[in-house]
A protein has these predicted regions:
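Rossmann-like adenosine-cofactor binding region
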Residues: 312-379, 384-386
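Glycine-rich phosphate/diphosphate-binding loop of Rossmann-like nucleotide-binding domains
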Residues: 161-172, 244-330, 334
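Adenosine-phosphate binding glycine-rich loop
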Residues: 237-238, 257-259, 358-470
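Short, Lys/Arg-enriched N-terminal segments with co-localized hydrophobic residues
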Residues: 49-77
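Short glycine/serine/threonine-rich phosphate/pyrophosphate-binding segments
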Residues: 153-155, 219, 242-247, 269-280, ...
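Residue-level detector of structural "landmarks"
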Residues: 26-28
Length: 487
């Protein structure tokens, strides 16, 4: 919600629940609050950290619904929401991150080691062997969260500086979920060639780079060129983070409905960076490309249309023009587009036990209750924290980078991403809650760090991109110790 420009006209889109749900705490916990003075039992300082968490510690009234596919009317003013967010970010030390000194600096002797003259010694060693930077500096546990502010989620092209709170929020998640230090870097540059050069010039500082909120199609080339150019992991989370969590939920949904992955028909609404990365992942997992139909704002991607290189890879030789024309007997709907683009009539056309991933945020392509109204046997996932099966990038990116840094991986490759998919899916299946309303772990599942990271690190070594092989038992024990210091 905090990612969206706060306009009165958007109030309906921002509702969390309605009808019989009654009054609900906007942090999306199960509690129902009776009045504005009631306290939310799950309200926490982390609530306003980062929009990808999908929560907000502001009270909403959700008493009324306008029509069958509309959202809800709330009794909250935008002033209250804005004030809560601004107060959170301005309270105490400004912003959300700070630097912590890790060595004692209590004496003149300490100072002589921390800075001149002692600091020259590690400089000389690193000059002889650049790999020593991982031993003598913070590089090995430091990620750059880098944006140019051209596609800040829900806000669009707001520029580098205005995107800084989001990047700080991402840094918070790296630290709180995986113990990774992160610096946010906002670059005021929209030319892809110059952006690549700037990031490449900055890369000696970091052990890995997380690209964030760079608009398509430029984001594809920026990531590809940096991956080719640099010897540290470069990861565009908007693409691949979404794809990994979608992949995990997808595998479990197939298992619950008894489907053969090679036979499923997938219809996708959306052809942006996240959507196409998700489709690449599904094909990597076993979906047949010829069984995938993709729609953008102009309709079905067909061989007759003039398409970008990325979209052309998904073009079908068909006369169908609209989503409604291709969704008949589809097993899976994948939505990364906008609210209202999936209709109940479309769901009725799908195969029995349809799998509906309506991931547009904050308002999905079709609300879960409306999907279930016409298909009670459906499995539904959204990007929202107030519904079951939340597809959230934070389930993977902290652990991917933790594994990549610890194994000294030169890149985050497909084998590592696939290992993360499989580990997340297995973690959900191992839980007693596993079922149609629990196909992926929740964000605060304390098993994530130890249950996902070792498998990713092992995949990095087995696929030849890790410079360090980690002992599985010892590494798991180290992660368990780290986990106790985090959330």
């Amino acid at each position: 919600l905090l990612y969206r420009r706060l306009k009165a006209s958007n109030l309906d889109e921002m509702a969390f629940a309605g009808g019989s749900h009654g009054r609900m705490c906007a942090c999306a916990c199960p509690a129902r609050v009776r009045s504005k003075t009631d306290a939310c039992p799950q309200r926490a300082a982390a609530a306003l950290v980062c929009g990808c968490i999908g929560v907000c510690s502001v009270w909403f009234c959700t008493d009324s619904r306008k029509d069958s596919n509309s959202t809800i009317t709330e009794s909250i003013t935008m002033t209250t929401l804005e004030q809560q967010a601004l107060e959170y970010h301005a309270a105490g030390q400004r912003g959300k991150i700070a630097i912590q000194v890790t060595k004692p600096v209590t004496s003149q002797a300490d100072l002589s080691l921390a800075y001149s003259p002692g600091v020259a010694v590690p400089c000389v060693e690193i000059n002889k062997d650049p790999a020593k930077a991982y031993e003598y500096t913070a590089k090995g546990n430091l990620v750059g969260v880098i944006t140019n502010g051209t596609a800040v989620l829900g806000l669009g092209d707001i520029g580098a500086l205005a995107g800084k709170p989001v990047m700080e929020g991402k840094a918070v998640l790296f630290k709180k979920f995986a113990g990774i230090d992160a610096f946010d870097i906002e670059i005021d540059e929209t030319d892809p060639d110059k952006l690549v050069d700037i990031i490449a010039a900055l890369h000696p500082t970091f052990g890995g780079i997380n690209l964030e909120d760079i608009k398509a199609p430029e984001c594809f080339a920026v990531e590809r060129r940096l991956r080719d150019r640099l010897s540290i992991p470069v990861f565009h989370d908007d693409q691949h983070g979404t794809a990994i969590v979608v992949g995990a939920g997808f595998l479990n949904a197939l298992q619950l409905t008894g489907r053969d992955i090679s036979l499923v028909k997938v219809v996708c609404s959306g052809a942006g960076a996240a959507a196409l990365a998700c489709l690449d992942m599904l094909v990597d997992l076993g979906v047949r490309r010829e069984n995938v139909y993709v729609c953008d704002s102009k309709g079905v991607l067909t061989t007759e249309r003039d398409l970008t290189e990325e979209k052309r890879a998904w073009a079908q030789n068909t006369s169908a023009k609209t989503l409604s024309e291709v969704i008949g007997m589809a097993d899976v709907f994948l939505g990364l587009s906008g609210p209202g683009l999936l209709k109940q009539e479309d769901v009725r056309k799908m195969a029995a036990q349809p799998i509906v991933f309506a991931l547009a945020n904050p308002e999905p392509e079709l609300r879960p209750e409306l999907v279930l109204e016409v298909a009670p046997d459906a499995i539904v996932a959204t990007g929202r924290s107030d519904y079951p099966n939340q597809i959230n990038n934070a389930l993977c990116f902290p652990y991917l980078f933790r594994a990549a840094l610890d194994s000294a991986a030169t890149t985050i490759n497909q084998a590592m991403k696939r290992a993360c998919v499989v580990a997340l899916a297995a973690m959900a299946r191992s839980d007693d809650q596993f079922g149609k309303s629990y196909i992926v772990p929740t964000l605060l599942d304390k098993r994530l760090l130890t249950g996902v990271t070792p498998q990713i690190a092992a995949a990095a070594f087995e696929s030849g991109v890790a410079r360090k092989q980690l002992d599985d038992k010892l590494y798991t024990a180290q992660l368990e110790a780290l986990a106790k210091t985090l959330l």
